[in-house]
């Protein structure tokens, strides 16, 4: 099973650049060049995300990223997609339907300092 996604496109192909969230985004941080979380305790947030999404009938937006300071553009695009897929698959295993997920790959970014802070998957609930 593969969760498909494209840069700035949701699973249904629509543009996701104008997404407005409900509540606060949740970040999952990853090790360098990996889809392994820095700390597995971060996964405790998934149960609450699933509970709220189901109770409030919300869509879950997933954005994967890599730090642009390491790796090539191609490697970072691939890595950011795999990070988003990883979190998406975990949400599906916890009972979220694929139709409720919108996933994007941000590729390599340098938005945050230190550079390790750019190795993430962000989860945002939306109406």
Task: Provide a role label for each language-model segment.
Residues 1-59, 117, 121-127:
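Periplasmic peptidoglycan-binding/tethering modules of Gram-negative envelope proteins
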């Amino acid at each position: 099973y593969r969760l498909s996604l494209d840069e700035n496109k949701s699973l249904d192909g629509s543009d996701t650049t104008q997404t407005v969230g409900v509540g606060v985004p949740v970040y999952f941080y990853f090790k360098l060049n990996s889809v392994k979380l820095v700390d597995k305790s971060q996964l405790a947030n998934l149960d609450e995300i699933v509970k709220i999404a189901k109770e409030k009938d919300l869509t879950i937006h997933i954005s994967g990223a890599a730090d642009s300071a390491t790796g090539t553009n191609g490697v970072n695009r691939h890595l950011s997609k795999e990070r988003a897929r990883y979190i998406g698959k975990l949400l599906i295993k916890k009972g979220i339907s694929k139709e409720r997920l919108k996933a994007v790959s941000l590729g390599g970014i340098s938005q945050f300092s230190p550079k390790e802070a750019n190795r993430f998957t962000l989860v945002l609930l939306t109406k």
